[in-house]
């Protein structure tokens, strides 16, 4: 998986995923007992550092024989994480680190079976497993809550990275190969195939990724950042198997490795296994992988590039992107990087920032350019600022505005209130608790540590905030001086512009064809024969049953039979039910509310997503939109609104439709947060056309940019559109219909009619009628929270007259959050809408897009959550993915991904992602059904599928999200326990019966959708709708 920016999460984003409350001190106490100089299983302790603000203790070590670096973060968190990363610094764009990342996971000395990595997804209870290729490092992380599982996964990961098989056929499959279009027909044409090859062809259909890649290549042109680490599709076929093996030998050595462990498991256990299984077998080398500093320019530079046309652009004439980019400080200077990240946020984040005012509100473009802000995932950090969605002729104007704004910031500085708001945001982010803190931590420190920076110093956020405040106190122009140093006088700046070319993809295709012709012409007859024979050998290998008995595995008996219960209390504030969930929230309060859409006229429904996206951004009460944003930043951790469409747990034709309001704050700020919600509910502003225009254009741009990354999601939403009433609403609210509607609105010259529609929606949903709320907070906060909820709910508007539901069939459903037999004062009632006349129908849709790969979704209507067969279908989806679809779609077909899944609303879906095939993949979906019906899987396969499903069922839940299954879905602990028992009870025959009953062609109604290039066969088939 190529992830160039994943490792460089900006500071604010990374910190947002912090910290579990310190329930106990055992893990940290154990870590504090270590002493610098102490030897443990071949490692020497270098440093032990408590970081109380994050409730952790950091232990830094080094391996005696190899020099491998090691950081252990002890914390009372059961979701333990391991990661090993290597500094990988390619000097060409063949994608060697990316293809190597894939290929090492295809078998190793201890585990020589094919694809042990994917097989372990079904033999463990992991909460995360993946691998990432960044610009200058490759990382292999996993996490799990089970100690035995941790040891199993660690064994597989260590053997994979240090002792991989690196077989030639695996290189062919994962990287690239020349192969006959039909491998069994030597007369069919030779073409390029390969998983990474197709993945990167798909990646480069994303114009934002293209822009970001060129930005880095051109701003840092002297070394590894000048190439595409993931692989340029036209360069990938230049990589040889021998070069791959050589790259592994020089880069995947312990002397070039950094190990990271996190959680409450004993450090000694990790060190012993890592030393004995891997590091003891190596000596020390000089890996020579360091990245030299970029030579600084004496004058600015400018570049122009081209890209494909965006068919969803709100204005076809405005598709140019332009940015000005500045090379900044070394990433290893952690306080300077911290300061520059804060300065960046102050310059670009939110409607009160200088660049937002100067660029976004200048009516020149639709949104900031890709990578806008502070970027800290290369040896030297950089800042980027610009616009997308502009006229090509306006590029110089944008450059002038940027220079002018920099001068204004240097002259006028930043308002103190905005600095306080940003520091308040940091305080919230340090208190907010995440279930994946270990993973976030690993990614946060990765880039700095990769270049010999101090990862422990990065964790001392409290110290940096104190030092930052002191710098401002001693020098009120501290930030202005930074602006002058890094932006006004910095000559290492680069302007990059990118404009669409209608022939772009045709030219790419022509270049690929020329590359292919060149390769084919150079082949001898013997080489052609070998290609045909190797193609047959690869198919044979991919089709041959594998023996995975060498791989470690948990057993179903290792799964906890009972779920932990969550205590919930339902109380009423007036007529509104409020769910209270007492949790150790570390000084935070979490608020949610659901307001019904049952009385909203049908003609207003398409505008609900737009209403949700803008209602907290238009101003309210005494605040204009800038003042509202400032108050939100000063008193909350964010306020969000989104559509809420949930199928009933017992009927696919019954559902809840509403709007979900969410926010969080420090406990001391709850009165201010609820006051803001009161102002939004009682006095929202719908009178600023220009503000709405800005927000709509940004939304349209964001949706358009998201299609290449989420094409399979859009295809699946479309495919399920005609299968259930909720499917129809999902397409309306979050599918391609919504994308096209927002595009149309963004093109409108007059926003008055839209504002009037939004104002009408407000009259139906910003009311206390048909509302329910929830609060998650610490025990000592509940009394205050209850009073604030009472004050809020009695202060917002109620309907002056009772409104009837637009759809006549309303079902009132009470939900009891506690197990039967327990006492509870009251229950909450949800008003669901039933559609007893709904008839599912088949529909096939092809969205013709200028992509070289396909995104495919095929869906089948099955049963709701509480149906006895739901558990069988859930297991079935997993077993079909792991035992059939993965091999057919990814290994044989060359798609980046594919599989089957069962949604909560009873839709059984097949999908593929960045797929070079289309109709043949649909045939594979049918073959998967035939395979499942015939029962060609073992009891071991069933048990593995159960493990995989339970890893999702039992994934950690943060205190902020406890009780949300009940509040949002009406699912009680008792219902979850019943479903759990049904999962345990699923048998081999249950799976074949479910396949026959629900997936058999002719007995089920299917919906199908493809997003991808034109297809002659589909165009000739009248059963397809072409869009």
Curated annotation (Swiss-Prot):
Would the keyword DNA-binding turn up in this protein's UniProt record?
Answer: no
Q: Which Pfam families match?
A: M16C_assoc, Peptidase_M16, Peptidase_M16_C, PreP_C
- The highest taxon in the source lineage is Eukaryota
Q: Which InterPro entries match?
A: Metalloenz_LuxS/M16, Pept_M16_N, Peptidase_M16_C, Peptidase_M16C_assoc, PreP_C
- Report if keyword Protein transport is assigned: no
Q: Which UniProt keywords apply?
A: Disulfide bond, Hydrolase, Metal-binding, Metalloprotease, Mitochondrion, Protease, Transit peptide, Zinc
UniProt PTM comment: A disulfide bond locks the enzyme in the closed conformation preventing substrate entry into the catalytic chamber.
Entry's family note: Belongs to the peptidase M16 family. PreP subfamily.
Protein name listed in UniProt: Presequence protease, mitochondrial
């Amino acid at each position: 998986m190529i992830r160039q920016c994943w490792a460089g999460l900006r500071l604010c984003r990374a910190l947002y995923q912090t910290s579990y409350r310190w329930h106990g001190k055992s893990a940290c106490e154990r870590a504090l007992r270590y002493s610098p100089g102490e030897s443990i299983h071949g490692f020497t302790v270098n440093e032990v550092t408590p970081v109380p603000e994050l409730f952790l203790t950091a232990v830094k070590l080094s391996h005696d024989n190899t020099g491998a670096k090691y950081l252990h973060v002890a914390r009372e968190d059961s979701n333990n994480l391991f990661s090993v990363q290597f500094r990988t610094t390619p000097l060409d764009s063949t994608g060697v680190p990316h293809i190597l990342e894939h290929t090492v996971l295809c078998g190793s000395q201890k585990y020589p079976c094919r694809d042990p990595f994917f097989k372990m997804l079904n033999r463990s209870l992991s909460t995360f497993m993946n691998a990432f290729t960044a610009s200058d490092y490759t990382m292999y992380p996993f996490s799990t809550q089970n100690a035995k599982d941790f040891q199993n996964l660690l064994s597989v990961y260590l053997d994979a990275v240090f002792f991989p098989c690196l077989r030639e056929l695996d290189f062919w499959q994962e990287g690239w190969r020349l192969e006959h279009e039909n491998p069994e027909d030597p007369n069919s044409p030779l073409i390029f195939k390969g998983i990474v090859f197709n993945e990167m062809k798909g990646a480069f259909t994303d114009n934002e990724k293209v822009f970001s890649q060129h930005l880095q290549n051109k701003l840092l042109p002297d070394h590894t950042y000048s190439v595409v680490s993931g692989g340029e599709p036209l360069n990938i076929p230049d990589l040889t198997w021998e070069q791959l093996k050589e790259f592994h030998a020089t880069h995947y050595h312990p002397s070039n490795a950094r190990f990271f462990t996190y959680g409450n498991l004993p450090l000694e256990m990790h060190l012993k296994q890592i030393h004995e299984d891997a590091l003891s077998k190596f000596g020390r080398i000089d890996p020579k992988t360091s990245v030299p500093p970029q030579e600084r320019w004496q004058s600015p530079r400018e570049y122009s590039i081209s890209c494909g046309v965006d068919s969803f652009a709100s204005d076809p004439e405005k598709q140019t992107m332009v940015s000005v980019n500045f090379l900044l400080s070394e990433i290893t200077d952690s306080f300077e990087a911290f300061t520059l990240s804060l300065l960046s946020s102050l310059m670009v984040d939110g409607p009160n920032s200088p660049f937002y005012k100067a660029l976004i509100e200048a009516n020149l473009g639709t949104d900031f350019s890709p990578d806008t802000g502070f970027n800290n995932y290369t040896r030297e950090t950089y800042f980027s600022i610009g616009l997308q969605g502009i006229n090509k002729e306006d590029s110089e104007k944008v450059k002038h505005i940027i220079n002018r704004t920099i001068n204004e910031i240097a002259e006028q500085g930043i308002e103190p209130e905005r600095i306080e708001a940003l520091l308040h945001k940091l305080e919230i982010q340090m208190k907010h608790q995440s279930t994946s803190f270990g993973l976030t931590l690993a990614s946060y420190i990765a880039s700095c540590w990769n270049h010999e920076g101090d990862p422990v110093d990065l964790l001392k956020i409290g110290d940096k905030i104190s030092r930052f405040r002191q710098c401002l106190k001693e020098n009120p122009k501290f930030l202005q001086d930074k602006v002058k140093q890094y932006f006004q006088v910095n000559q290492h700046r680069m302007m990059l512009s990118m404009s669409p070319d209608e022939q772009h993809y045709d030219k790419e295709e022509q270049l690929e064809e020329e590359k292919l012709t060149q390769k084919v012409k150079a082949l001898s007859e013997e080489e052609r024969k070998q290609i045909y024979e190797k193609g047959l050998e690869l198919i044979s290998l991919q089709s041959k049953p594998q023996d995975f008995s060498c791989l470690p595995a948990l057993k179903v008996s290792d799964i906890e039979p009972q779920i932990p219960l969550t205590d919930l209390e339902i109380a009423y504030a007036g007529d509104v039910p409020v769910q209270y969930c007492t949790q150790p929230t570390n000084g935070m309060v979490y608020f949610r509310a659901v307001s019904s859409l049952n009385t909203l006229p049908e003609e207003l429904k398409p505008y609900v997503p737009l209403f949700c996206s803008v209602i907290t951004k238009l101003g309210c009460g005494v605040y204009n939109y800038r003042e509202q944003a400032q108050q939100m930043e000063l008193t909350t951790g964010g306020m969000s609104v989104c559509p809420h469409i949930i199928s009933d747990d017992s009927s696919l034709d019954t559902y809840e439709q509403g709007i979900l309001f969410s926010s969080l704050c420090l406990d001391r700020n709850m009165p201010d947060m609820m006051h803001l919600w009161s102002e939004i509910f009682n006095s929202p502003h719908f009178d600023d056309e220009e503000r709405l225009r800005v927000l709509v254009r940004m939304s349209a741009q964001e949706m358009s940019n998201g299609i290449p990354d989420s094409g399979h999601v859009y295809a699946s939403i479309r495919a399920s559109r005609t299968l259930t009433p909720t499917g129809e609403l999902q397409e309306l609210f979050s599918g391609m219909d919504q994308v096209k509607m927002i595009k149309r609105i963004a093109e409108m010259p007059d926003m008055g009619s839209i504002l009037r529609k939004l104002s009408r929606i407000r009259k139906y949903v910003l009311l206390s009628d048909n509302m329910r709320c929830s609060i998650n907070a610490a025990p000592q906060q509940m009394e205050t929270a209850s009073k604030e909820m009472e004050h809020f709910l009695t202060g917002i508007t109620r309907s002056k007259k009772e409104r009837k539901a637009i759809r006549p069939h309303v079902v009132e459903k009470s939900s009891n959050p506690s197990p039967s037999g327990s006492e509870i004062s009251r229950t909450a009632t949800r008003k669901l809408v039933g559609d007893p006349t709904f008839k599912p129908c088949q529909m096939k849709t092809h969205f013709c897009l200028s992509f070289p790969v396909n995104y495919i979704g095929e869906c089948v209507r099955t049963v709701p959550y509480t149906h006895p067969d739901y558990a069988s279908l859930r297991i079935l989806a997993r077993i079909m993915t792991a035992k059939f679809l993965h091999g057919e779609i990814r290994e044989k077909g060359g798609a980046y991904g594919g599989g089957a899944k069962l949604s909560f609303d009873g839709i059984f879906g097949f999908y593929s992602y960045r797929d070079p095939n289309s109709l043949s993949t649909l045939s594979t979906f049918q073959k998967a059904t035939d395979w499942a019906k015939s029962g060609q899987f073992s009891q071991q396969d069933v048990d593995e599928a159960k493990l995989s499903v339970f890893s999702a069922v039992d994934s950690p839940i943060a205190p902020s999200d406890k009780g949300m299954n009940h509040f949002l879905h009406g699912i009680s602990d008792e219902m979850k326990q019943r479903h759990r028992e049904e999962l345990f009870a699923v048998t081999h025959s249950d799976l074949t019966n479910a396949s026959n009953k629900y997936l058999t062609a002719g007995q089920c109604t299917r919906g199908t959708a493809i997003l991808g290039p034109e297809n002659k066969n589909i165009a000739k088939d009248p059963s397809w709708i072409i869009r």
